[in-house]
Each structure stands twice: as structure tokens, then as C-alpha cells.
Amino acid sequence: MKKSFWISIIVAGGLILAGLACIAVGHGLGGHRILMEDSLYDGHTVDGTHHISQDFDRIRINVIAAGVELIPSEDDKCRVMTKDSEYVEYTVSVVEDTLVVRATDTRKWYERLFAPSVSGRSVKVALPREEYKSLIVETVSGQVNINVRYTFSEDVTLTSTSGNIGTAASIGGHLDMRSTSGDLYAMGFLNTVTARSTSGKITLGGKTVYGDCTAATADLETTSGEIRVKTATLERLSAQTGSGGIRMESVTVTGDTSAETTSGGISLLYATCGSLTAETGSGGIDLTDTTVTGHIQAETTSGSIRFARADAETLDLKTTSGSVKGSLRTPKIFYTDTTSGSVDVPKSTEGGHCEIETTSGSIRITIED
């Protein structure tokens, strides 16, 4: 009796929940014709322009599924241009010296269950000035683009779930960029940079009309995407990825440089560093025309370590099954250790130490004339 009683209770509860769901969906269908009708959720879009007369020094934009772009104003007046829809409302105001742009999805929760997501929208902000204090942009799936002309004296925060983020602005405070699956790109004159992505690519550096990218410190991290740093000058650089590669080209880092990946390769081309730590599990490490004024610590499990006209004051190199080969620019005192591989290094009594350890790989180093 007890068992059949509880079975009846569970079945009855399930029927009640199913009935409530049907009522909710039925209400949505009755109140709004056909829920999946294209003209209802994916219909016409009306371009809206919001004119701003008040002055402001800070900008905050929070939208749902729209791209965000800052563009110069042609008439020295601020305008916020939105692509409104019947189900997304934009509010634009100036509150406590801050331009606030906010989007709200006006649909009921049950109207969103089977309806297409609100996407393909855009927000463009035409700014009359080129210098502001701070900027915050948050969007779910839209792209974020910040023009090279702008300067922010304080912090800039840019976040998107699946959209790409790019900025070429000059930023005096901290730049924080975050996306789950979107790519991140930053250039310009920067102070400190943090870039985080799960599966997107991260790129730092590049030339602008005002010059090369500069930054005090940069912390770049992605789970499965690539990390690239090009044409940049920094004081400290940290690049970390799970399964992607790390590439640095035409980069100057006056302090410490750290590059770490699990299964990707690490390569430096025309780079100068104060010190270098490079670690990878199954990828190779390549240093070409690269000079490290201090120490190089390079380690890989199954990949090889290769040099081409590279140099450092001291080197510690370690690989399990890969080889260590290449050319250095100045003499070194070599200390080698290999289990089954061959060894061919110059015999020298001057220079910094170069310790090389491998289990089954060969060791072959030459000194450039």
C-alpha cells in the first residue's frame, strides 16, 4: 500500500507540473498569436538615435546580444545609435558623470523558451571627444570594437560571452578583457593588461598610426586558443594556454617573460627579454634571433628545443624525448647529460653556463662566428 501510494503521488505531481507548463505556453500563444512566427521575433528593426546633450567623462554599456562600437562624432555631438526591436528596449542617460547605455529584453520568460534569441543588433556610440576617464562594456554575444583615437586615463573593462573584443585605444589604467569563446585583440599605448578566454585566440600588439604597442605588464591566458604577441614593448609578460601555441615576434620585454602551454609549441622571433621561462608538455620550443640578457629556463617533455642565432647569459635546457639543437652567439661552458642520445657541443672555458639534459634526444650546439 505504501509503495503504490507514493507512486501515485509522484505521478500526480508530474501531471500537475506538465499542466502548469502547458498553461504557461498556452498563455504565450494566446496572448501573442504564434510564438514561433517570424514576424513576431525576427521581424523588422527600427534604427534609433539617442541625442545626448549632457557632458560626461565615463562610459558604461550593458547590452544583451549586440555589437558595440565607439566611433568619432562628425559634428562634436554625442549620439547613441541603436537597432531597436519590438522586444529589446534601450535606455540611454547620463548619471553621475557617466553615459549609461542599457538594453532590456522585454519578453516574458515563457516567451523566450522556444523563440529565437535576439541577435544581430548593434550599438554605435559617436563620441565628441577623444579623451575620457573610464569605460565598461558588457555584452553576451556581440563584438566589441574600440577605435584607436580614444584615450582613457583610468580602467577599461570589456567582456563578451561569445563575441570578439578588439581595442586600439590608449589606456592609462588597467585593461581587463574577457570572453568565453571569442577572440581578444589589444594594441595601442597600454599600462597593465589582463586578457582571459576559454577557447578564443589572444593577440597583443601591432602597429597603429600612433606607433607600436607598449604596456607595463600583460597577463594573457586561454584554455585552448593561441596567444600571439607582435611588435610590442613591455616590462613583463606572462602567456599561458592549455592546448594552443604561443608565438612572440618583434617583442621587447625588459623584465621577465613567461610562456607556458600543455600541448602547443612556443616560438620567439626577433625578441629581446630580460629573462625567459618557456615550458611545454608535448610541443617544441624555438628561439630565432632572440637575445635574453639574463637566464633562459626551457623545458619540454616530448618536443625539441631549437636555437637559431639566439643567446642568453646562462641557460638551463631540459627535454625527455626531444633533441636540443641550434646555434648560440657567444661561447658557453656546457654541462650535458643524456641517456641514449649523442652529444656534440663546443669545448669552451669561458662564458656563462649552459646546462642541457635529455633522456633519449641528441644534443648538438654550435657557436656563431
Region locations from a protein language model:
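Acidic (Asp/Glu) and glycine-rich low-complexity loops/linkers
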Residues: 1-160, 166-179, 183-222, 228-241, ...
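Short, catalytically relevant binding-site loops at active-site mouths
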Residues: 284, 294, 304
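C-terminal amphipathic alpha-helical segment
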Residues: 286-289, 307-309
